[in-house]
Amino acid sequence: MSPRNSALERFRQHQKIPEKRWQRLAFPDVGLLLCWLALIVIGMVMVTSSSLSEAHVERLSTHHFAIRQGIFYVGSSIFAYIAFMLGTNFYREKAKFILGLAFLGLLLVYAPGIGVVVNGSRRWLNLGVINLQVGEFAKLAVFIFTAAYLQHHTQRLDHSWQPIIGLLAVTACFALMFYLQPDFGTMVVIVATVLGMLFLSGVSIWRLLLLGVLIAPAMVWVLISESYRLRRLTTFINPWEYQYDEGYQLVNSLISFGRGGLFGVGLGESVQKHQYLPEAHTDFIFSIIAEETGLVGALIVMAILMILVWRAFAIGYLADRMRKRFSSLLAYGIGLWLGLQSLINIGVTTGALPTKGLTLPLISYGGSSILMTSIALAILARIDAESRFIARLEGKI
């Protein structure tokens, strides 16, 4: 066995290689890192601008939310570094444990003194310094487990329904937990991403269509089972008819887009953020981006998010070429997750989709979302670094 093949085999078996860890990994994808940095800069600027009025109303310091957002970015960077250094084998081997931890967290939101209720939803755990939104952790946990599960059952996916049903049963358990919180947006993202990962793992399109036919009635029932969801559905079709009731938020979001025009009214000059548009610094921050930077600024943000998703799929493709199936599926899953969540958030703010409480990745204010998105991107960077290392040893790059 040649020295090159020997090193490659030891790497795949997660054995020690004489070089230091940082020396045996390739530098992560530059496009991924640049998009990551760009979204952080945009998020910092836009949260600073969009939160000024909210801070004043809540009698907080002018830059209260901006300072906290900066702390979230710094703290998340530390956890992202740790996530990067752990390596992909850690996530594959601990997938069940991570999934169990996420499910436990979803149960603890009902525990008195620990669970936090906000606007009637039980989504947060009180950890003292921060309220952790467990759903953000659960999304990543489900996708890590799905990648490990599909890798383990690779040979059976083409001819057996059993592994598919097993995965859907786990997904259904988490979907039920999100239904009870309630958090319909996260439920949609998880179910759609798992189905996407099944497709990318090689499950035939006919099986997926059959699953879609079976799942669709359940999703429709969830959508219409609660009166407030049904009102959201009817409101987004014609928000102006309900502009002083259920359509108030969407109408003011659309006004933001109208005021922004092509080039925007200028940074810090938004009118809608002054208590006209609820959640201006969180779920509806894209509306303020459109108002202050115009269509041009909104398209730039969308382009950065699209490039980020593209790089995730490119990383997954390279990992697949290097026969790293778990890494490949996880990269695809992260790409699907970030793409779907961005699409839904932008769709909601533009009136293309009913209102849902999903953040714009890395831009919206919120520690839990920033933390888990940063960890997910760090895992992507690790997947890319490992795949490039193997490709370099095999002489493929």
UniProtKB/Swiss-Prot annotation:
GO terms for biological process: cell wall organization; FtsZ-dependent cytokinesis; peptidoglycan biosynthetic process; regulation of cell shape. It catalyses: [GlcNAc-(1->4)-Mur2Ac(oyl-L-Ala-gamma-D-Glu-L-Lys-D-Ala-D-Ala)](n)-di-trans,octa-cis-undecaprenyl diphosphate + beta-D-GlcNAc-(1->4)-Mur2Ac(oyl-L-Ala-gamma-D-Glu-L-Lys-D-Ala-D-Ala)-di-trans,octa-cis-undecaprenyl diphosphate = [GlcNAc-(1->4)-Mur2Ac(oyl-L-Ala-gamma-D-Glu-L-Lys-D-Ala-D-Ala)](n+1)-di-trans,octa-cis-undecaprenyl diphosphate + di-trans,octa-cis-undecaprenyl diphosphate + H(+). GO terms for molecular function: lipid-linked peptidoglycan transporter activity; peptidoglycan glycosyltransferase activity. The chain crosses the membrane at residues 27-47, 70-90, 97-117, 127-147, 160-180, 186-206, 208-228, 295-315, 329-349, 360-380. Pathway: Cell wall biogenesis; peptidoglycan biosynthesis. Pfam families: FTSW_RODA_SPOVE. Residues 1-26, 91-96, 148-159, 207, 316-328, 381-397 are cytoplasmic. It comes from the Bacteria. The keyword ATP-binding does not apply. Signal peptide: none annotated. InterPro entries: Cell_cycle_FtsW-rel_CS, FtsW, FtsW/RodA. It is a multi-pass membrane protein. GO terms for cellular component: cell division site; plasma membrane. Residues 48-69, 118-126, 181-185, 229-294, 350-359 are periplasmic. NCBIfam families: ftsW. Belongs to the SEDS family. FtsW subfamily. Peptidoglycan polymerase that is essential for cell division. This is Probable peptidoglycan glycosyltransferase FtsW. It comes from Dichelobacter nodosus (strain VCS1703A). The gene is ftsW.
